[in-house]
Amino acid sequence: MKSENNLIWIDLEMTGLDHKADQIIEIATVVTDAELNVLAEGPVMAIQTEQHYLDGMDAWCTTHHGNSGLTKRVQESTITMAQAEQETIKFLKPYVPKGKSPMCGNSICQDRRFLIEQMPELEQFFHYRNLDVSSLKELARRWAPTVYSGYKKKGAHLALDDIYESIEELKYYRQNLFLPEFQQ
């Protein structure tokens, strides 16, 4: 089952967008094969965070994380940042050799920024490249507006739901943006 062609999908929820000031409060991972078939779902963890980080969230984060139940899960969590990092690495090791999978997801550069600051060992588990579904979305918006308008995200803003949505979105773009003769 371990393959350097497997893909690691990751999503983080944070208290804001500033990787220097805000905190990761949820992490989830999924491993797929190269054809985007799900091989395994990693642990989904709300990460304990000092209350002042939650109190400092902007209106968007306060509303969305509150409505989804994430804020309450974070307040009740006993999982530290270090524990979440190590549990995630432990989950990934049987599926992908270190340094082989690009970091996969939507707007994944933002997640990478937070990982560099708060989970550097996990960030180093990934290849330096990204497989960012939002890049395809931006190209479709500019060059194939019909394709762009054909996919609607639900936007749950829970880490695991967002990963599955990103995988489905990439499948959609694969089917609708790339020429059939180049698909396997």
Curated annotation (Swiss-Prot):
GO BP annotations listed: DNA metabolic process
Domain Exonuclease span(s) in chain numbering: 7-170
GO cellular component terms attached to this protein's record: cytoplasm
Pfam families, A to Z: RNase_T
Localization annotation: Cytoplasm
Keyword Cytoplasm: yes
SMART domains recorded: EXOIII
Family membership: Belongs to the oligoribonuclease family.
Protein name: Oligoribonuclease
Species per Swiss-Prot/TrEMBL record: Hydrogenovibrio crunogenus (strain DSM 25203 / XCL-2) (Thiomicrospira crunogena)
Gene name of the record: orn
